[in-house]
Design a protein with these regions (language model features):
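Short acidic/His/Gly/Ser-rich catalytic and metal-binding motifs that mark active-site loops
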Residues: 25-29, 71-73
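Early exported N-terminus immediately downstream of N-terminal targeting peptides
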Residues: 60-61, 65-83
Length: 206
């Protein structure tokens, strides 16, 4: 009998919160009213709560942003070139939104493709940190978030997606993406996950 399961609670010393692409570029590039409203009203407040809970529990808080290594974008993936996704190195578009700005010494990975694990060395760094489980939040649910979930799972991480700390351009696309990746991850609301982190953090200190 297979007793392995994805339903493993967060173990703070071996976990990281990964916040994907919540940056100035994604605000300016979007024309979706649903996306902008859900980001402002739901995602950002919930990401802030996750940051607070994770920092308090000693869980690494890590960010990814879309950002070229060059000013002219010649290093971008072919897909990003075709799609017109161009965030020059050092530009304001590459900055994490002020509402959830990284704290001192929190890591920001700069990527040039939809897949964080393909175009950065994050897997190497996570293994150096002893991370075995990832809490994933950010944008877009059906694009960069989904890509990260699938690859993280294939690389051997236990993944929890925070369903009300992610969004995309429509409710339908958000729900379809969550349905499609259900076999790769746990899915929790921010309320449930913050409570879980609090309990497990307390248990660690007892």
């Amino acid at each position: 009998m297979n007793r392995l399961s994805r339903e493993v609670p967060i173990d703070p010393p071996h976990a990281a919160l990964l916040i994907i692409d919540v940056q100035n570029y994604c605000i300016g590039a979007s024309t979706s009213e649903y996306f902008l409203r859900s980001l402002r009203d739901t995602v950002l407040p919930n990401v802030r709560r996750l940051q607070f809970a994770c920092r308090g529990a000693g869980i690494e808080v890590i960010y990814s942003v879309i950002e070229n290594m060059t000013r002219d974008g010649r290093d971008r993936s072919l897909d990003y070139k075709i799609s017109g996704i161009d965030v020059p190195r050092g530009s304001s578009d590459a900055q994490v939104l002020d509402e959830i700005a990284p704290a001192e010494d929190e890591m920001v990975f700069r990527k040039t493709s939809s897949n964080l694990f393909i175009s950065t060395n994050i897997d190497y760094v996570l293994r150096n940190l002893g991370v075995r489980s990832l809490i994933i939040a950010g944008i877009m649910t059906d694009q960069c978030v989904e890509s990260a979930v699938r690859d993280a799972c294939d690389l051997g991480y236990l993944v929890t997606v925070v369903i009300d700390a992610c969004t995309t351009t429509s409710a339908e696309r958000h729900e379809q993406s969550l349905l499609g990746i259900r076999g790769y991850c746990r899915q929790r609301t921010s309320d449930v996950l913050v409570a879980e982190i609090s309990v497990n953090s307390s248990n660690q200190s007892d």
